[in-house]
């Protein structure tokens, strides 16, 4: 990764995150096996100042760029992808809001102060009946005015990091306004609860349980956004944290396979299997796919970080997610082919990488939406 490190700040944080990732890796398999959300790891990231990095410097944060975030997140994911994905949602939400939000300045300043003090926030937008919010479905969660306050009722699924969040950004349909609003809700607000429903084969340690809202009463200023169209319609480079996670998983799989091939020497060969042409072929293919994915991802991040070039990005952000995620799937598959049947052992990290990397297919934007948009733009040009 030295090729992609551009300054001393990045180098210092990469060294710090590298140490944290290596520490987290020691218990990643146990967290996965138990389906346990590692709250202590999120606290470690809080204590390190990591959770305030994407907060603008004008509001007391680190003010890092999308490019910076991807560097750090990819490294963290090599050691512990579920933890990296979890905190990545917080980092991306704060980065997006700081870049250009329509919130009341006093409300954002309050949230910024909370983040400086270690608060963690995530959006809660997905529902069982609507699917991904990027598809544009109307949320079943609803908000109505009662005695000068907002009463919010509903249920959200896939609420990542639910057990560690201090604040939830909840989408709810407002009938009077005929649009979807976003409400800022604190974890201790009466009527809010977490139902532990998360039991997936992939990303088992993200604690993405259901958020249940039962007559949660909120002050008027807790309505912080009114959405115009489906979420995801506006280009958001901070969502590149998603492919960065799966690039990290792929790199971890590649590293394991290369080490295995360098050390494993069956008695049918005069040396390790790294000398076998088929192994060299697959290893070279892994390297090529990782090179393509990494360079494309970080180039798009650089374009997005440039305010002059950012408006010219159309489908590139979605294409980056598609290219990187599918390359990661392929790399993990090749790594398992190199290692062979041992990669299927429950104690082998490759089987965990295989399960975790598949979650990328179901993070936004979806592959079919990316391809459809590319085709539409081709015919409109």
UniProtKB/Swiss-Prot annotation:
InterPro entries: Acyl-CoA_DH_C, Acyl-CoA_Oxase/DH_mid-dom, Acyl-CoA_Oxase/DH_mid-dom_sf, AcylCo_DH-like_C, AcylCoA_DH/ox_N, AcylCoA_DH/ox_N_sf, AcylCoA_DH/oxidase_NM_dom_sf. FAD binds at residues 158-160, 337-341. The keyword ATP-binding does not apply. Keywords: FAD, Flavoprotein, Oxidoreductase. The keyword Kinase does not apply. Gene3D superfamilies: Acyl-CoA dehydrogenase/oxidase, N-terminal domain, Butyryl-CoA Dehydrogenase, subunit A, domain 2, Butyryl-CoA Dehydrogenase, subunit A, domain 3. Induction: Induced by methionine. Repressed by sulfate via the cysteine metabolism repressor YrzC/CymR. Its cofactor is FAD. It is an enzyme of class 1 (oxidoreductase). Its EC number is 1.3.99.-. Pfam families: Acyl-CoA_dh_2, Acyl-CoA_dh_M, Acyl-CoA_dh_N. One of its GO terms (molecular function) is acyl-CoA dehydrogenase activity. It comes from the Bacteria. Belongs to the acyl-CoA dehydrogenase family. This is Putative acyl-CoA dehydrogenase YdbM. The lineage of its organism: Bacteria, Bacillati, Bacillota, Bacilli, Bacillales. The gene is ydbM.
